[in-house]
């Protein structure tokens, strides 16, 4: 009888652990006209995720969307483009860095960076053509990502 109870308990623990690995965490990013870091921002503007985590981009203010920046998506990963004024949920399965923009406000510097899993920022991200106001914001996010390198 004791062996049966031990087997059932072991199976229950194994099942609960495997179920926890199957589902990622959920995050929310607000798209704002005005935020803590100025006008036309994502909050937060930098996220560290694990593969399988999901981000819900919330159009808190009108005229925003979330879309990947050309040239700033990990090799083998698909980009995405949400519709204006609509929430979009994206599950990030591929490790690497994702540059994200608001299409209508890219020229105003509305960008964010998402890091999924481990790894270093690809050097070619620094040479991607960007609007003048987006470049300093992304450079600051690149520095933040590099400062987090190796942290859990």
Where are these regions (language model features)?
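Short, conserved beta-strand segments of beta-strand-rich sandwich/propeller modules, principally
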Residues: 97-99
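Histidine- and aromatic-enriched segments that form or immediately flank copper-ligand environments
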Residues: 58-83
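Extracytoplasmic/periplasmic copper-protein system
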Residues: 24-35, 108-152
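Cleavable N-terminal signal peptides
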Residues: 10-12, 22
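N-terminal edge beta-strand
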Residues: 25-51
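N-terminal signal peptide c-region/cleavage motif recognized by signal peptidases
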Residues: 18-19
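Bacterial N-terminal signal peptides that target proteins for export
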Residues: 1-9
